């Protein structure tokens, strides 16, 4: 039978699943009331369990033309609706609805306008709104006109919708808006604001922006003010120039408060083996000078930067960041693209960084494994590692002969409880020697954590070592 809904039902005592099957005829009023005795308890609909994506005509008639006018889900609070051409909106869009997530597939968008009209008239209390719609489409104006009637939003997220200047201005004037995500900023945005009407998001604490080009995001930031934003996340596809990256960070300094910003994430999202040669030819290198504008934000706790650039940061560079942000919780640099360097941070530099930032819970850097062979002067007894840490070593090169020294060092420093990873980035598999590096690191992490036993390096002949070797081989494959 064709399933219509798979919904999570929650009341004071239990959570369970309701499945509503196809109708072969219109239900009468008694049958409808029996059905509503169950559906009135539904607070949340998380989607549609319809493998064929389409509903038969009898079911549509039954749902959209019931014998009574009362809504089918009178107490519905949250709705995530995905991939249907026809939505029985009149019985889903109710005044109790406060959270709405519409996820349309290609070809589904003709149903959008009718649904938005019903939502606009029957759902005055929506506070959390998300719309994902595939491009190309012609519904930008329709959606903008609809959102302008929403004045109580606390969170708004969109993907695939291009907003005009009037829409940006409207969002900035919603007094309750705390979270905003605009993940489809055009390459050449046509926005113009007068000095008297420039958008100021005075209540916004979380802002996410995405575009093909970093310059487009910079353009929007330059036209707005985010005086209390705490979390700023920027995603883009194309590899930015050095000038574009510098301009972006400079714009952030002028747009955001130096005191309120806690998290900054600047991440390229497009990774391809076929782009590697083109991107490497750019020769861009991330240095301390590129990151220095971020140091104006004195309360930063989370810094995530991922670019299709080489990384050229030294021990002293990271310690300079640590001195500025001693309470830093996460520092993630090129966790997907890699550092693309034969060097990296030395063991001494890593330990000094961990000592300076005892609150670190996430760290992604590249290290020089040859430095682990030398004695760790000054840290044998006095080193206090952060209590828990997810340590990613990015694309750090490793020699098989250094595996034993690395295991001994990590164990001596009390890092056995750490979560380790290396060579897991999407774009690292095309680097020469990636498979062997990942293999060797998995041996290191396995022995440090106590997962593997037997001779270090997997050279033993006992049965447990053979099983460990097979396990490492499986984990080393992409």
Residue map of PLM features:
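Leucine-rich repeat
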Residues: 1-478
């Amino acid at each position: 039978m064709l399933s219509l809904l798979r919904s999570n039902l929650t009341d004071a005592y239990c959570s369970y699943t309701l499945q509503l099957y196809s109708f072969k005829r219109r239900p009468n009023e008694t049958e409808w009331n029996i059905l509503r005795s169950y559906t009135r308890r539904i607070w949340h609909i998380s989607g549609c369990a319809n493998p064929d994506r389409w509903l038969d005509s009898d079911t549509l008639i039954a749902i959209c033309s019931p014998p009574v006018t009362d809504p089918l889900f009178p107490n519905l609070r949250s709705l995530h609706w995905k991939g249907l051409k026809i939505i029985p909106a009149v019985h889903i869009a109710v005044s109790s609805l406060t959270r709405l997530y519409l996820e349309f597939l290609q070809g589904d968008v003709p149903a959008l306008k009718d649904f938005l009209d019903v939502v606009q008239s029957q759902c005055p209390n929506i506070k959390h709104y998300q719309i994902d719609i595939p491009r190309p489409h012609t519904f930008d104006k329709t959606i903008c006109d609809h959102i302008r009637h929403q004045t109580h939003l606390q969170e708004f997220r969109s993907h695939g919708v291009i907003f005009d200047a009037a829409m940006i201005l409207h969002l900035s004037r919603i007094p309750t808006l705390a979270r905003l995500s605009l993940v489809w900023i055009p390459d050449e945005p046509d926005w113009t604001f007068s000095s008297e009407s420039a958008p100021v998001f005075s209540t916004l604490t979380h802002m996410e922006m995405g575009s093909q080009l970093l310059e487009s995001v910079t353009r929007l930031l330059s036209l707005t003010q985010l005086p209390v934003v705490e979390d700023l996340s920027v995603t883009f596809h194309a590899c930015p120039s050095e000038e574009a990256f510098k301009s972006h960070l400079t714009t952030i300094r002028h747009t955001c408060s130096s005191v309120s910003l806690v998290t900054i994430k600047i991440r390229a999202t497009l990774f391809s083996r076929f782009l590697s040669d083109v991107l490497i030819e750019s020769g861009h290198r991330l240095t301390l000078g590129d990151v220095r504008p971020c140091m104006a934000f004195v309360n930063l706790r989370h810094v995530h930067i991922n670019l299709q650039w080489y990384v050229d940061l030294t021990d002293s560079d990271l310690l300079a960041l640590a001195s500025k942000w001693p309470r830093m919780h996460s520092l993630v640099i090129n966790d997907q693209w890699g550092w693309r360097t034969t060097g990296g941070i030395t063991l001494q530099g890593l330990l000094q960084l961990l000592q300076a930032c005892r609150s670190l819970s996430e760290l992604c850097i590249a290290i020089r494994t040859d430095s682990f062979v030398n004695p760790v002067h000054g840290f044998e007894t006095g080193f206090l590692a952060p209590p828990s840490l997810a340590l990613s070593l990015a694309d750090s090169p490793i020699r098989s002969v250094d595996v034993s020294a690395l295991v001994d060092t990590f164990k001596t420093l009390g890092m056995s409880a750490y979560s380790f990873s290396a060579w897991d980035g999407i774009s690292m598999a095309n680097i020469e020697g990636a498979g062997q590096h990942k293999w060797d690191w998995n041996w290191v992490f396995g022995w440090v954590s106590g997962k593997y036993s037997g001779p270090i390096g997997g050279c033993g002949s006992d049965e447990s070592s053979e099983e460990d070797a097979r396990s490492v081989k499986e984990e080393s494959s992409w």
